[in-house]
Amino acid sequence: MKEQNLTPMEKLATFIVDKRNLFFLLYIFALVFCFFSTGWVNVENDITTYLPEETETRKGLTIMNEEFVTYGSARVMVSNISFAHGEMLKEKIESIEGVSEAAFDSSAGHYINSSALYDITFDGTASDEISVHAMHEVKEALAGYDVYINTEVGVDSAADLKQEMQVIIVIAAVIIVAVLTLTSRSYAEVPVLIATFGVAALLNMGTNFLCGTISFISNSVTVVLQLALAIDYAIILCHRFSDEHEPLEAREACIAALSKAIPEISSSSLTTISGLAALAFMHFKIGLDLSTVLIKAILLSLLSVFTLMPGLLMLFSKLIDKTGHRKLLPQITLIGRFDVLTRYIIPPVFVVILGVTAVWANKCPYCYSFTDLTTAKQSESQIAYQKIKNTFGAGNMVAVIIPSGNYRAEASLLQSLESAPEVKSAMGLANIRAMDDYTLTSALNPRQFSELAGIEYEVASLLYSAYAVNDDQYGQILKGLDQYQVPLFDMFLFLKEQMERGNITLEEDIQETLDDLFDQLEKARLQLKTDSYSRLVVYLNLPEESQETFDFLKFIHREAGRYYDDNNVYVVGNSTSDYDLSSSFGQDNLLISILSALFVIVILLFTFKSAGLPVLLILVIQGSIWINFSFPYLQSSPLYFLSYLIVNSIQMGANIDYAIVISSHYKDLKKEMRPKQAIVEALNEAFPTIFTSGSILAGAGALIGQMTTNPIISAIGVCLSRGTLISIGLVLGVLPQILVLGDQIIERTSFELNHINLTPKSFSGVTRVQGRIRGNVNGIVEGSFDGFIRGDMEALIISGKASAVTEESFKAEYQGKSYAGADTPTLSDSGGKENQAPENIVKGESANEQTNKTNI
């Protein structure tokens, strides 16, 4: 291969192959860096973080996190004990340091059918060490009992998921090695492929820190999906190298293979990238997170295939030659023949199935809460949750955040909510009982407060005077303090402040009583009141997710709107999160479906240069999507909405590659044989690629679905595996018939893009030229001509064509034509005689002919 005759792509391939040791060194540095940088990645485990900023849940959670303290809690059920034994355990639990309260009584909400339920509250948040240690002590105290614990305290779901994914990756690696061995042409190709994608995976994990914070979904499934989605790229280059290596040496074969594979692989990756890019347009920002991380994974896989794998192929070339083996995958000629025989039967049946499944998929029951999703593998926490739910029911709590300061309005709102049959209980400062039937927000005058607190009236009067001065209410002092009323909660906090400053000293027994009271009031303040907001805690008799629940959330807003500006009222909880997600799902679903299909159609339009073929391919893959999401409807099993959005985009962006590879082979083979024969041969040629990619993606999805306890990740895996298998079935059992029947449509809607190839082409010897060219020949030619050029030619082929011919072909064609100034078809070097053949004979447009140097 002459250096001056190389195309730009061949020059790039030559540089990569010849500088492979430099690339090895760069990858070593990058891998060392990424090994350490993987620990820099921040992983977000709370999916509500990705809710749009304008949603009520996101606004409310921001206020709650900034203004209030939420103490850790646990629901603990102990079965097969008597009520008396249950009371004994309550005292035992409450004696543990770090446990604030263990609610238990004889009501059906706490004791039923020999099972006791304790609602435990800790002295710290769910992540505080005091709560974690107390939870550990509770487990030890209940060891030996039939106990079920549902809590977030001391539970590291991220670590559990990471451990599960490590096991999944190991098993997936074994499956991938087995599949690659079946589809390889040499056993030594397998370590090359594994090394290439091992490097790509580590590079992706090591660069995730550039995204700032990524979701636990992206962090857990990206590695497996990266391998499954991008393994084709390495296989294409590997097979190209194998083909080129038959007549060429390893270096030349690698250069030729890489120069041909780069455009082929790049175009193949566009459909996958476009499908993933559609996720970025979701209102739910988890889509942008997944899109960013997965597209980065695909791009790094491409980089590894283009720059690392050629060097590995050169390194392993001798071993690849020695370990070659026969094809292990069988031909699927029988399937191809069956497709041809059923070409008039399957398509009509498919159209009917398409219509039915489109309706079923539209009726797919979606869910927006993952608490009730069941997984094939259950964690102890999930088992406990289901056990407690089946015995005592599931708790559904929402927090109502309102402006603080108006205790009367708060009390009225609480009373209104408690009177609703949908409410189990409602709690706020305005309805928490203190002493003598007073609530914490009851307004007391000095005499009432002195009697309640057990202090002298004079001390209480001084305290009220100081409070009035501190609150700039001097008029109350002038009017007299007997009628001056201050909410009990505010006055106790003011009393505490004055005692801490040393302005008031009480008797020791009263001091101890008030200290205990102050501790309880401080906890209540941290949980329920700040300077700007108050928080009401409402327990509902409704499921976490239902239309009735969503309607009642609107009722809460209407009631709160009677006392407060509704723009300053926020209802926060799992139910509101589900409502916000359901509100945006319809729009996100439509957006992703349209964008992913549109992106893919545009790419296919320019790939196949046909308007009909992309529509047929999209129809088949869309059919696989509808069939996939008909299963939840038929099984009456709710589907987590995020599973639909993610799998929909992956199926449209990645599974369509299976249809593309069959169509590409069919279109090429159709030039050499009849459509029926072409489709059979196309299936045989495409099957190894489809088998490799499809089996890995389906296997990876099945592993994720069956081996993780995280309901979101599991749901994605199950849908992805099922969707991939359906896609494979349709492209092998339906698409061939459609291609054969629709052959006329494909041909009639085909088009060619007129373009100028600006890449100079070089020829030496006798060259046939048909068209308009511009460049250096031997002489100056500008105009229309149809003939031959003798000598060296380097020119742009503006229109028409040019090709080298043999002496014999030249003489044979020359004898049948008459060229000006030529009598004898004799070819010789420049400087010929009068009766020699002309030195420059071309077909096309030419002008300005000279005898020495020709610029065309």
Task: Describe the role of every protein-language-model region.
Residues 39-75, 363-401, 515-523, 765-771, ...:
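Solvent-exposed, non-transmembrane loop/terminal regulatory segments of multi-pass membrane proteins
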